[in-house]
Amino acid sequence: MQGAKSLGRKQITSCHWNIPTFEYRVNKEEGVYVLLEGELTVQDIDSTFCLAPGELLFVRRGSYVVSTKGKDSRILWIPLSAQFLQGFVQRFGALLSEVERCDEPVPGIIAFAATPLLAGCVKGLKELLVHEHPPMLACLKIEELLMLFAFSPQGPLLMSVLRQLSNRHVERLQLFMEKHYLNEWKLSDFSREFGMGLTTFKELFGSVYGVSPRAWISERRILYAHQLLLNSDMSIVDIAMEAGFSSQSYFTQSYRRRFGCTPSRSRQGKDECRAKNN
């Protein structure tokens, strides 16, 4: 079965997190977060999701900020390679064609409420962490999870994401933007280096990310700066320059709009949390 070899026990991970402030994370492939205990808040460029135990998030490849609000939380992470997802769509194409098509912009995060069937599926996935099993069993369990997603109220959104994966330009665009978003390029430079006309580039970008290139680049830069702020000793002015902001004052304004406080206050809060933990 296609993809079975890549979905062994080591791929499904049980994580224990205690994140008082927002922490920057990069997912190099699509996947599912399942909140087992505690709290979990996940933000992308235009949405915030606060999960209760039993709820699930399908997240696309990309960058996010996460927090557990200082609570000990247990999360199940299920990575999904593009190859596996494409195989799922091909394998069950006739059945999945029954899912209503969605014309809305494709989101970066899709939330799924807890249901008895999803709870049973998650229980089976957790069992794979503690018992030896054939790799194909993990594949079947994850296909079951995706099928439940597809025929839930959020199924049309999920299918929009999965159908995009068959477009060879989508993954190339994602890799290209992750590599070059810090470059001081005009939008025309991005489109030229990608090998597309500006109008076509904008259309592809909007269909993949659901926002304009300028908005996405600004968000990625502010998230990168946030990560440096919390995890390095660089000065704020150096962080602003490193993340592609024209000045410290512009960075401070952008950061305040995004996180509701100044960079210096955010760093102070991180240091206070660290002192309490010590």
UniProtKB/Swiss-Prot annotation:
SUPFAM superfamilies: Homeodomain-like
Phenotype of null mutants: Deletion mutants are defective in expression and secretion of type III secretion system-related exoproducts.
Function, as annotated: Transcriptional regulator that plays an essential role in the activation the type III secretion system (T3SS) operons. In addition, ExsA directly regulates the transcription of ImpA virulence factor that cooperatively inhibits the functions of host macrophages together with the T3SS.
Pfam family, one: ExsA_N
Domain HTH araC/xylS-type, chain residue ranges per copy: 171-269
Induction of the gene: By cAMP-dependent DNA-binding protein Vfr that directly activates exsA transcription from a promoter located immediately upstream of exsA.
A GO BP annotation: negative regulation of protein secretion
Regions recorded as binding DNA: 188-209, 236-259
Protein name in UniProt: HTH-type transcriptional regulator ExsA
GO molecular-function terms, A-Z: DNA-binding transcription activator activity; sequence-specific DNA binding; transcription cis-regulatory region binding
Keywords, comma-separated and alphabetical: Activator, DNA-binding, Transcription, Transcription regulation
Assembly, per entry: Homodimer. Interacts with ExsD; this interaction inhibits ExsA activity.
GO CC aspect terms: protein-DNA complex
Name of the encoding gene: exsA
Organism field: Pseudomonas aeruginosa (strain ATCC 15692 / DSM 22644 / CIP 104116 / JCM 14847 / LMG 12228 / 1C / PRS 101 / PAO1)
